């Protein structure tokens, strides 16, 4: 074998080995590239999924805050309506003496007090403007077996009476102011039931 043949053979083997190395290198580069692309795609998909989850959480949080705010505003409006109702009742009670139904109301308050205090001497105290009405009512009520006396002691009230059993000084205050306070809780519950019906 000649030197030239040996050199050619070495050259061919070297070139074959270079081609093999380059082919392996190309495969490795392709695999590395494919692996890198897969990692990038996985990272992208993961980030998109995280972003969508964050968006859903933000939307849910905002919806929750909006619901809470809406309920708060509705509650405030209803509470304001309730306040207005009580203001109107209070205004009505301040002018009750001028109403056509007041004589019946005053007599009903005297009768209720007399029935609760029982058959004994009872002093009836009224506002000075109500003395004539009270005297007429007392006259009618005494015909039913009661012993009511119109007291000289005046009371300052928008309407109604204070009755006192003389024997033991037990007092029933049926003035509109005290009755309003007594009935206020009951009225709040009733009005709330109407205004807040169906609220959770």
Swiss-Prot record:
Belongs to the V-ATPase E subunit family. GO terms for biological process: proton motive force-driven plasma membrane ATP synthesis. One of its GO terms (cellular component) is proton-transporting two-sector ATPase complex, catalytic domain. GO terms for molecular function: ATP binding; proton-transporting ATP synthase activity, rotational mechanism; proton-transporting ATPase activity, rotational mechanism. Has multiple subunits with at least A(3), B(3), C, D, E, F, H, I and proteolipid K(x). This is A-type ATP synthase subunit E 3. It is a peripheral membrane protein. Keywords: ATP synthesis, Cell membrane, Hydrogen ion transport, Ion transport, Membrane, Transport. InterPro entries: ATPase_E_C, ATPase_V1_Esu. Gene3D superfamilies: ATP synthase, E subunit, C-terminal. Signal peptide: none annotated. Component of the A-type ATP synthase that produces ATP from ADP in the presence of a proton gradient across the membrane. Pfam families: vATP-synt_E. It comes from the Archaea. It is found in: Cell membrane. It comes from Methanospirillum hungatei JF-1 (strain ATCC 27890 / DSM 864 / NBRC 100397 / JF-1).
């Amino acid at each position: 074998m000649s030197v030239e043949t040996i050199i050619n053979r070495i050259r061919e083997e070297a070139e074959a080995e270079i081609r093999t190395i380059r082919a392996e290198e190309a495969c490795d580069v392709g695999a590395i590239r494919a692996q890198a692309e897969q990692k990038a795609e996985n990272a992208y998909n993961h980030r998109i999924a995280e972003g969508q989850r964050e968006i859903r959480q933000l939307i849910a949080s905002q919806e929750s805050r909006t619901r809470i705010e809406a309920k708060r505003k509705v509650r405030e409006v209803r509470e304001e309506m309730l306040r207005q109702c009580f203001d109107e009742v209070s205004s009505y009670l301040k002018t009750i003496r001028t109403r056509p139904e007041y004589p019946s109301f005053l007599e009903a308050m005297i009768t209720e007090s007399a029935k609760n205090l029982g058959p004994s001497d009872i002093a009836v105290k009224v506002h000075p403007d109500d003395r004539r009405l009270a005297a007429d009512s007392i006259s009618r009520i005494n015909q039913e077996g009661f012993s009511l006396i119109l007291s000289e002691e005046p009371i300052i009230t928008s309407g109604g009476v204070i009755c006192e059993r003389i024997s033991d000084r037990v007092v029933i205050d049926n003035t509109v102011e005290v009755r309003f306070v007594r009935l206020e809780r009951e009225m709040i519950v009733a009005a709330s039931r109407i205004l807040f019906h169906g609220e959770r």
